[in-house]
Amino acid sequence: AQALAGSIVKFAVHLLENPGTLPEAVLSRIAHKHTALGIVEEQYPIVYENLFWAIGEVLGDAVTPAVADAWTEVYWLMADALIKIEKGLYSQQANDRMWTDWRVVAKEPTGNAAVTFRFEPADDTPQSRGRAGGYVSVRLKVEDGLRQCRQYSLSEKAGSTTERVITVKLDEGGEVSPMLIQNVEVGDVIELSNPYGDITLEDEDSTAPLVLATAGIGITPAAAILDALAQQGSDRQVLLLHGDASWE
């Protein structure tokens, strides 16, 4: 809720400072995240009702009718823009499903407290080609029986339609990474979203120098970009800057 409220405030500030324009970069990032979670148009009124109920509970009498009307207008301006972008992103996919089944075909320890999972499709659903730097959502049941989603960068073979590769770092206080690393084994089937991501290697034929700056497990999208460049035999000049707590 805090992230959502912050995004709406940033959107409002942009409208005030740049009349007649939209914050395209911010909207694109949010839209890619939404589509990776399977968010659809029908859910926006539900979000609106709950968000504005929470605002009223916290701010009380400060939320006058005029204030409520102003922020309602901002919310729906932002929502309508996102809905349009998200419909476009969904239409670009090879299937119309939010989640498809993928089978774990390999599970490999990678560095310090990280594991690389390799998946192949568990059925004949057409699959989309991802982009280096992009990500997929993983959805699985956690200990309380509820389904949780997390996004993981494609760390290798991002453009494949027959394989997905992600590298997961263990977050001992988390819900999803411990379940993946400790409970999911080769042969298991889990749900993945279609690939999304707004910071990707768009122009694979470019010869312009490329700088990649990463830290920790954030190396994974950069690894996918390097893999894609290597696969196409690119002679592009690349500078990788990486910081980590361990040489492992």
Regions of interest found by a model, annotated:
Residues 1, 6-23, 74-83, 124-129, ...:
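Charged, low-complexity, helix/coiled-coil-prone segments
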Residues 16-18, 66-72, 81-86, 102-103, ...:
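Generic detector of short, locally flexible boundary/turn motifs and exposed helical patches
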Residues 47, 178-248:
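FNR/FR-type flavoprotein reductase catalytic core
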Residues 2-5, 130, 148, 216-219, ...:
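Alpha-helix initiation and capping sites
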Residues 22, 31, 122, 172, ...:
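Short, functionally important structural connectors and interaction interfaces within domains
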Residues 1-99:
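Globin-like tetrapyrrole-binding proteins
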Residues 29-32, 39-41, 156, 178, ...:
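Generic structural "secondary-structure junction" signal
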